[in-house]
């Protein structure tokens, strides 16, 4: 049986996927809204990449709630390309969608696209990663800083203080990369010896290559925090000769990541719930168009999974 250590319950619970009110408000939801039923909405969805199981699950969560409410969904895959994502969002604006749900490739590069949607009076909801500018109706995400701290706490518990560890970082510029790294680094300072940190772009193959290079430079390395499960799986392949005392912690809780924990390939993951995250984002859009106020930040649950 998996051991789940619950960090927090989401600010919004989906009861039968019905429309649930969100308390509080953001500037986008304070003005008068042309109310629409879910079945009358056309929702644009821009995902950073569908070549990652986490974001496939996020897309599926949106699609499931949309199907239950007869909502039209237009999904575009940015393929981890910031220019393509901006063009995709421009296309969605031209198609006069009612709302855009965006999972940014890069939190800075997405700003002009968010501002373009603002200028077209199309509300924007960010998922998993935020935008560094423009006006958002809300951001639906886990507490990434707290998740990074949880990873550091777990590694210290397993290896003790002053253990030599490395970090595999995500896409440079993504808010999740910054926040997970900050949470880990702040807690690890003075407690762990972080000998190296390099970006592997949230990618499994790059995680393998980067981890091989780190191990060549630091043969006495004792563990690694990878900012997502894909990189953790690459790191596990590179460190397969290190044995079970080598600690690998991922982030996301993907199907492949959870299986790797069962198989003893990685030690733990900070598990998000991407399908629920997608549902929460679409539910926020439903609430907005029913005239309800929407929180500026909606938290999605986060757990530490160790077996």
Located regions from the model:
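Flexible loop/hinge segments that line or gate small-molecule binding clefts
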Residues: 99, 107-146, 157, 164, ...
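Sec-dependent N-terminal signal peptides of Gram-positive bacterial secreted proteins and lipoproteins
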Residues: 1-24
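Bacterial lipoprotein signal-peptidase II cleavage site
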Residues: 17-38
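Hinge/cleft segment of the Venus flytrap/periplasmic-binding protein
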Residues: 39-41, 168, 172-176, 187-188, ...
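Short, solvent-exposed amphipathic alpha-helices that sit
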Residues: 54-71, 147-151, 175-192, 206, ...
